[in-house]
A protein has these predicted regions:
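Conserved alpha/beta enzyme-core scaffolds, especially Rossmann-like or related mixed alpha/beta domains
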Residues: 1-36, 76, 162-164
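Active-site cores that bind ATP or allylic diphosphates and position pyrophosphate for catalysis
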Residues: 34-172
Length: 172
C-alpha cells in the first residue's frame, strides 16, 4: 500500500544518511578492487565472500589523494573492534541471533566506487522511513541482518523484527 519507491531515484536521501555516518568518523575511502580482495584476503566464507581486513582503513590524507588520482574509492564503514562487534538481535522464527561483525564480515561498503549506494544502507533507510516493523525474508539473507541491525542503531532508527524463513530447494 502506498507509493512505490525506487532506490535508483533516492540517491540524495541516501547521501544524507551516508553523510551522518561519515560525521561519525567511521566511514573511509577504500581503493581495493573486488578481484584484489578475493585474490589477497582470507579466509573466504562459505558463500565465497571475504572478511575485509581493513587494508585502507588508516590511509593518510596524502595516500588517499595519491590513490584518488588512479581510481575512485568505494566507501566503507569501520565495524566495532572484535570485543564489541557482537550484534544481537531477535528473529521471530530463530530466536536470539548473534553475529560478530569484525570476525564475520569486516568493514563493509556503504557506497560503491561508481557512486551507487550499497544495498545495506539503502534498505535500512528505506525500511526505517517507511515505518517497516517486520521483515520476512529467506534464510539466505540472514548473514546481512546483523549489518543492517547495526546500521539501524548507528542511524538512531528503531530496529524491526526479522523473520528468516527456510528456502524451498526442491519439490519435496
Amino acid at each position: 500500500e502506498g507509493e512505490v519507491l525506487f532506490q535508483s531515484e533516492r540517491a540524495e536521501l541516501y547521501r544524507e544518511y551516508f553523510e551522518k555516518l561519515r560525521e561519525s568518523a567511521r566511514v573511509y575511502p577504500c581503493f581495493c578492487s573486488r578481484a584484489a580482495l578475493h585474490a589477497a584476503e582470507a579466509p573466504h566464507l562459505s558463500d565465497g565472500s571475504v572478511v575485509y581486513s581493513g587494508t585502507c582503513r588508516y590511509l593518510s590524507a596524502e595516500e588517499v589523494a595519491e590513490r584518488e588520482k588512479r581510481r575512485s574509492p568505494a566507501w566503507r564503514i569501520q565495524v566495532p573492534a572484535e570485543e564489541s562487534a557482537e550484534i544481537r538481535y531477535s528473529d521471530g522464527l530463530l530466536g536470539e541471533c548473534l553475529q560478530n561483525l569484525a570476525r564475520e564480515c569486516g568493514d563493509f561498503v556503504l557506497r560503491r566506487a561508481d557512486g551507487v549506494f550499497a544495498y545495506q544502507l539503502a534498505v535500512v533507510v528505506d525500511d526505517a522511513l517507511s515505518g517497516v516493523t517486520e521483515i520476512v525474508r529467506g534464510e539466505d539473507l540472514r548473514s546481512s541482518a546483523a549489518r543492517q541491525v547495526w546500521l539501524y542503531r548507528m542511524l538512531g532508527f528503531e530496529t524491526p523484527v526479522f523473520y528468516h524463513i527456510p528456502l524451498l530447494t526442491d519439490a519435496d
